[in-house]
Structures are given as structure tokens and as C-alpha cells.
A protein has these predicted regions:
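Structural signal for hydrophobic packing residues in well-ordered secondary-structure cores
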Residues: 18-25, 43, 109, 155-161, ...
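Helix-rich terminal scaffold detector
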Residues: 2-11, 178-310, 314-320, 331
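Conserved active-site and cofactor/substrate-binding residues in soluble primary-metabolism enzymes
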Residues: 5-12, 27-30, 34, 58, ...
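Short, low-complexity N-terminal leaders and the immediately following helix N-cap/first helix
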Residues: 1-73, 102, 146, 335-360
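Short, glycine/charged-enriched hinge/interface segments at domain edges or termini
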Residues: 2-5, 62-230, 235, 374, ...
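Residue-level signal for inorganic ion chemistry
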Residues: 17, 60, 154, 190, ...
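Flexible glycine/proline-rich
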Residues: 14, 28-33, 42, 88, ...
Length: 417
């Protein structure tokens, strides 16, 4: 474990805490209709091939290309229509390989038939009992969805830890799954600290600010599939904070605070955390987001509840949640961590940078004449400037060891939109 009170790189900090976090929630069985947004507790394997039989991919005529290829195929074929196959009402009986079957999209292809000719390429007799067409460009299995083409029986349809999206709901339904085993939703307690913080909608005392962090963090928690527990605002009092943190740890799987983690006289979080449990690290070598505490709150039975003390400035709280807290919560909840989408871009202008910390700068993205991304660093980079975060397309990542960067330097940009 690195020195808890020396600034940690983002990677070192994430490793220090995530390596000691393991899945902590139990599994439960729920109806598929209620499973959206939840995380699978175990792999789901398909009980059968999907589709179960070869199906036509379009309206037309099914026939045996392999049988007819034995004849002279330079001339148009003239075949007798011997039956019909519709979706849900397949052709039954013997399909004469010297003839063809009228078939519609989604209908089962008769056994022994291995191609479908689109109806627009077919000429029909007045009675519809005879058709004529050329097989030019038609290969075996043309316009046929083969059995197991979407997913084979016994194959893993969705892996454990997958978040169940609308598309995943459709896949599970297509293989006949009506009940799924998912992880219980992770419960995350959220509270703000500080005498200067007030709830939105109420009066704003002189020198106070409305609490933007708690709503921000609760929405970020929901976005990763966990359930936030709103514990309100705790004033700058060590005993009160200790009481609230103990309570939070008793009802939640993880605890997040914002504010109270710098070195001000009224910032009690560090001392309280040391009295309640242990601290993995206290500072990050990043900007914004340097003052971030992470550790565990211990209870009397020896259980440990992960704790994250985020900075009071909203942009710093956002950056530290995305870089540290979110991945740890996903691991805790049994989810497969999802990395934030990233693009490679070039700086639109030279940018100042101090070696020894990773910087996350709000930026706008445009395409240059060659179609490559260009990152224009926003003028406002204050850690309290929420509007600049809303307006940004992404966060330009300036590497830990880099110094000043020249115009055109290649960087990663974490996408926000």
C-alpha cells in the first residue's frame, strides 16, 4: 500500500482501493420485464439455436440450388410452385427439389432447400403455378438466415456483470428467458458537508451556496445502475459528521461525502475517518480533484464499508467520481466496469502544463479539414465552474509526466456528450 498521505496518481489510487474491493451484493431472481438497467449475476446461455430453423430473409421463392445446379443453369429456370411457407405457418410435407415453394420473410425454409430468390427477380405465370428466374449471382444459402445464426444453443448470450440494456432485454426474450438472476442494486449513501451549503429551493443565507454536489452525485450513481440514498447536509462539526457516517455505513454498501477534505480548520473528514476506520489515500496527483479521501468505515462486527470523500468544488467532484468512485462502485456491485468513451484529438493551441499531475481540462471538439478531432481548451477551468462543464464536449487528458504541450500535440479526450 502506498503512503496514504502522499499524492497518488490516478492509476495508483484506483489500484489501491479497487484491489481491496470485491463484489458485496447478493443476487435475486426477477421478471425480465423488471430487469432493465440491472446487472446479471451469472452468465445466461441460450437454451436453443436462434433462429431455431433456417428462415427466409425476404419474400420470394425457396428452391434447391444444389439440386438444380446439376442441370444446365445457363438458361433461366422454370419451376412449378408446389406450396407456400409463411411465418408461423410453415410448409408441411415433402418439398419436391425439382420445384419451388412460395415463401415470405421470417418463414421456415423447407428441408432440402438452400436458397431463396427475391420475388422481384421472378416472372410468374398467370395462374401463379409456374415461375421463371435466373440463378445468376445466387449462392448456396442466399437470403436465408441459418439456424443458430444469431446465437447457437449452449452459447453464452450475455455474460455475468453485463448491464441489461433494452437490446439485452430483446435478446433474452428471443431465447425464451422470462426470469433473470441479477445483482441486488448497490445502495450508496450520499451527504454533503459544510456550514456554507444550503438545499436548493430554500432561502440562501449570506455567504452560503446552494448544494449542487449532492444532486450531481446522486444522478451519477443512478447512471451506473446503483441506488443513491440522500442523507442531506451535515454541518461542520466532527461529532455530527461521525454520527452521520456511522449511520450511513449501517444502511448502505458505500458512502460518499463531498466537501470537508481539504486542509481548512473546519474540514473534519480526515480526523473523523481515522477514528472510524482506515484511509487508503488522501490526495490525488490530478487537477481538478487533488483533495480526495478514500478508505473504509469499520463497524463493530468487523465489516468494512467503502468510503469516498470528494472535493467540495462540483467539477472536481465530477472528475474524481468518474476516475475513481464510479469504477469502484461498479466493482462493488458486481458489474463489469465500463470505460468512458475516448477519442484521440490534437490540441488546437499550445497549453500550459506542470509535470507531476494529470490534468482534465474542459474542451470543445471540432473536426479539421482531414476529419481529425481538434480539442479547443475552454477559457474557464475553475473547479467551481459548472456551466463550463455543461458546455464542454469532453475532458482533455494531459498526461501526468507531460510539461507544456504544443499546438497539435496528440491527447486523449474523455467524451461527455
Amino acid at each position: 500500500m502506498p503512503d496514504a498521505f502522499a499524492p497518488q496518481t490516478l492509476d495508483m489510487a484506483l489500484q489501491a482501493i479497487s484491489s481491496q474491493i470485491s463484489e458485496s451484493v447478493s443476487a435475486e431472481q426477477i421478471p425480465l420485464a423488471a430487469a432493465g438497467g440491472r446487472f446479471l449475476a451469472r452468465d445466461v446461455c441460450s437454451p436453443k439455436d436462434v433462429p431455431a430453423h433456417p428462415l427466409s430473409a425476404m419474400d420470394g421463392f425457396a428452391f434447391s440450388l444444389s439440386h438444380l445446379n446439376k442441370a444446365d443453369t445457363n438458361k433461366p429456370l422454370s419451376l412449378r410452385v408446389t406450396g407456400k411457407s409463411l411465418a408461423g405457418r410453415p410448409f408441411e410435407g415433402f418439398a419436391d427439389p425439382a420445384g419451388c415453394i412460395r415463401i415470405f420473410t421470417g418463414a421456415r425454409v423447407p428441408e432440402g432447400f438452400d436458397a431463396v430468390i427475391p420475388q422481384e427477380r421472378v416472372g410468374q405465370s398467370t395462374s401463379g403455378e409456374q415461375v421463371e428466374f435466373s440463378t445468376e449471382g445466387i449462392s448456396p444459402m442466399a437470403n436465408i438466415r441459418q439456424a443458430g445464426e444469431d446465437i447457437a444453443g449452449g452459447a453464452v448470450a450475455l455474460a455475468a456483470g453485463t448491464r441489461i440494456s433494452p437490446q439485452a432485454i430483446a435478446l433474452l426474450a428471443s431465447i425464451g428467458i422470462a426470469q433473470v438472476e441479477v445483482m441486488r442494486s448497490l445502495r450508496v449513501a450520499v451527504l454533503s458537508t459544510g456550514d456554507e451549503v444550503a438545499d436548493p429551493g430554500g432561502p440562501l443565507p449570506e455567504g452560503a451556496i446552494y448544494d449542487a454536489n449532492r444532486p450531481l452525485l446522486m444522478e451519477l450513481i443512478r447512471a451506473i445502475g446503483a441506488d443513491p440514498i440522500d442523507l442531506g447536509i451535515v454541518r461542520d462539526d466532527a461529532d455530527s459528521l461521525r454520527h452521520h457516517l456511522r449511520h450511513a455505513a449501517s444502511i448502505a454498501d458505500a458512502v460518499i461525502t463531498s466537501g470537508g477534505v481539504s486542509v481548512g480548520e473546519a474540514d473534519h473528514t480526515r480526523a473523523v475517518m481515522q477514528s472510524l476506520g482506515e484511509i487508503a489515500f488522501w490526495k490525488l496527483a490530478i487537477k481538478p480533484g487533488r483533495p480526495l479521501a478514500a478508505g473504509w468505515i469499520h463497524n463493530e462486527s468487523g465489516q468494512r464499508t467503502p468510503f469516498f470523500g470528494l472535493p467540495g468544488n462540483p467539477v472536481a467532484a465530477f472528475v474524481t467520481f468518474q476516475g475513481i468512485v464510479g469504477p469502484c462502485l461498479q466493482r462493488l456491485g458486481g458489474a463489469t466496469p465500463v470505460k468512458q468513451p475516448t477519442v484521440r484529438a490534437r490540441l488546437a493551441r499550445a497549453t500550459k502544463k506542470t509535470p507531476g499531475r494529470t490534468e482534465f481540462l474542459r474542451c470543445k471538439l471540432t473536426r479539421d479539414a482531414q476529419g481529425d478531432w481538434r480539442a479547443e481548451i475552454a477559457a474557464s477551468q475553475g473547479a467551481a465552474s459548472i456551466k463550463s462543464l455543461v458546455d464542454a464536449d469532453g475532458l482533455a487528458v494531459l498526461p501526468h509526466d507531460a510539461g507544456p504541450l504544443a499546438e497539435g500535440a496528440a491527447i486523449d479526450v474523455l467524451l461527455l456528450k
